[in-house]
């Protein structure tokens, strides 16, 4: 099968410099959603017709399996498909999709392709309560489709029809090539309509059949930011529905955003306002508090994530206790039963089982052993202005509050670092190491007194 995706439109009503098909739904361009769906049909030729912002579109979705055709002037959908003809295989049917209609399901497209077979022209249609703005499906007395009439060219009788054309069609490519060559632009828009091929098919004795999607929202397109927001909510609602059906507890299904792939084990609970980006996996019994942002992260079984945490490219071990207001940056790997508390930032560090940094700390480029306690205000001073250096804290180390660990530095097994220490050399095992200025009391000192204003 050939698949052609039309993605040349400017999208004036979007009021944006970004090509319309690159506006995101669930964190990825609308066009990427359409391409992902198209790929599940295993097409032999996959062609994207670009126009406005062509280079941006090529850069965003270019891949080895995608060919591009350019529509320099946007002269209608029929004209757009004409640009793809040199790239198509006449021995196989062609399916036409739209880069700004991102939610059409694979099952719906398979149903349309199956209905059309190898010799018929298939049209995806829906009935709408208010069909204003859409091309109407005109049938004869026997119920056969005879033509599609666009809204601006329709009579009052035709405008009363509620069955509309979604624009998605499939037909034999050799016929399509012949029909497109005969299109005229003598209509109110001055464009070459792809829908006019239906009347050509009828005249040539090619049967025209229709199929319908499982839900109306599958065929909704995006022409404005309002419609983009509506599509986003529909998509997120569908994701939430699938999560609920899989056994995930969502404290408010209307307040979750998945911008990638979220997989969950059993008995997972997600509070309101959470955002999941990229590939995220939550193992059995995980609880995620309100308003967390989690990107490309695995969270181990039984972990409890408190509200307002941010994770990116991280791994949380089983039974972890994280947050609130904790940040795990790329390269963070936490072992079992690790506690990371409020206003703690971890970056490119490995922290082994049962270790804790409960509040107000920065741990960067560090290797932390088991049962380590990192006191409040501890900082790994990992950057010298040019290079990053590592800090090593071996098992059973205790770091007192307000300690600066100036990397590269190692604290040996069982060592204790006194509060307020600036550590610049290795601390030996099982000993107390500290550095601090001599404490003094000045008996003759007087606090300055602020003079009253005159």
From Swiss-Prot:
The active site is at 359 (proton acceptor). One of its GO terms (cellular component) is membrane. Residues 226-246 are annotated as: Linker. One of its GO terms (biological process) is regulation of cell shape. Residues 247-454 are annotated as: N-acetyltransferase. Mg(2+) binds at residues 100, 223. It holds the Pfam family Hexapep_2. Pathway: Nucleotide-sugar biosynthesis; UDP-N-acetyl-alpha-D-glucosamine biosynthesis; N-acetyl-alpha-D-glucosamine 1-phosphate from alpha-D-glucosamine 6-phosphate (route II): step 2/2; Nucleotide-sugar biosynthesis; UDP-N-acetyl-alpha-D-glucosamine biosynthesis; UDP-N-acetyl-alpha-D-glucosamine from N-acetyl-alpha-D-glucosamine 1-phosphate: step 1/1; Bacterial outer membrane biogenesis; LPS lipid A biosynthesis. Its EC number is 2.7.7.23, 2.3.1.157. PANTHER family: BIFUNCTIONAL PROTEIN GLMU, NUCLEOTIDYL TRANSFERASE. This is Bifunctional protein GlmU. It comes from Cupriavidus metallidurans (strain ATCC 43123 / DSM 2839 / NBRC 102507 / CH34) (Ralstonia metallidurans).
